């Protein structure tokens, strides 16, 4: 069950300005201290529910794992469609655990390609929004963050190498409509499928399934085009 390749994220730039505004947050990211940097609040809003995605929706257990990611430069990447998932991404996508990917990010930091770890809360069943703040500077202006669609075989949402410093300015606010990815590591076809390791592992793709298994095609609802949620990045 490996979807058609597509590496498009719908990104809407609401405004660009040199000065941002303040705000509060429900979570703080851990990582390196950023000197002369800027702070952003990431708000993850879920639109995954039985109304928008009714086919085999896992009522009572639908949730998202803790947000995990990093700020980095162009020499690093967390994931990419058309490429194999790292062990850390695989474990997030299959189990929601972040220990392995945090170790991978630590290795990237040791190479000098990542500045800060982004670590936020999960989104439990019945809740629709979670926030995390993080800092970055012009040398590490790219952001990558993922979270598991749970339960699922190996599905996740996120952004990779999103640039918050554009045309010499920090983006004031950026909304990303999230598509759902298949990590290529498990052959399960629906949210509650039993474990079935893919061998050999396949490349990350946008999630496409049979209409009887889920509503997803190319990462969004096959007929309505509904996205599973949004990431909003707002400068503080």
Question: Would you name each region that the model predicts?
Answer:
Residues 1-9:
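Bacterial N-terminal signal peptides that target proteins for export
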Residues 11-17:
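Bacterial N-terminal signal peptides
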Residues 18-36:
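Bacterial Sec-dependent N-terminal signal peptides
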Residues 23-26, 184-236:
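Activation corresponds to long, low-complexity, non-globular regions
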Residues 33-39, 47-157:
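Structured domain cores in non-transmembrane regions
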Residues 146, 153-201:
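An exposed acidic His-Trp-rich patch
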């Amino acid at each position: 069950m490996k979807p058609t390749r597509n590496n498009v994220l719908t990104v809407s730039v609401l405004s660009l300005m040199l000065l941002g505004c303040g705000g509060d947050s429900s979570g703080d990211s851990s990582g390196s201290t950023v000197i002369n940097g800027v702070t952003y609040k990431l708000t993850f809003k879920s639109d995954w529910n039985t109304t928008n995605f009714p086919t085999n929706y896992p009522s009572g257990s639908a949730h998202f794992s803790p947000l995990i990611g990093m700020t980095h430069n162009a020499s690093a990447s967390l994931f990419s469609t058309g490429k194999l998932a790292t062990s850390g991404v695989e474990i997030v996508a299959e189990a929601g655990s972040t220990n392995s990917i945090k170790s991978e990010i630590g290795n990237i930091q040791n190479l000098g390609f990542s500045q800060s770890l982004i670590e936020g809360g999960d989104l439990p069943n019945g809740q629709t929004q979670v926030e995390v703040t993080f800092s970055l500077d012009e040398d590490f202006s790219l952001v990558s963050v993922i979270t598991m669609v749970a339960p699922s075989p190996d599905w996740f949402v996120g952004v990779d190498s999103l640039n918050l410093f554009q045309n010499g300015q920090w983006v004031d606010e950026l909304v990303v409509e999230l598509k759902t990815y298949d990590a290529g590591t498990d052959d399960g076809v629906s949210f509650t499928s039993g474990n079935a390791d893919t061998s050999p592992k396949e490349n990350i793709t946008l999630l496409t399934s049979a209409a009887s298994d889920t509503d997803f095609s190319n990462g969004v609802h096959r007929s309505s085009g509904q996205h599973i949620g949004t990431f909003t990045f707002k400068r503080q």
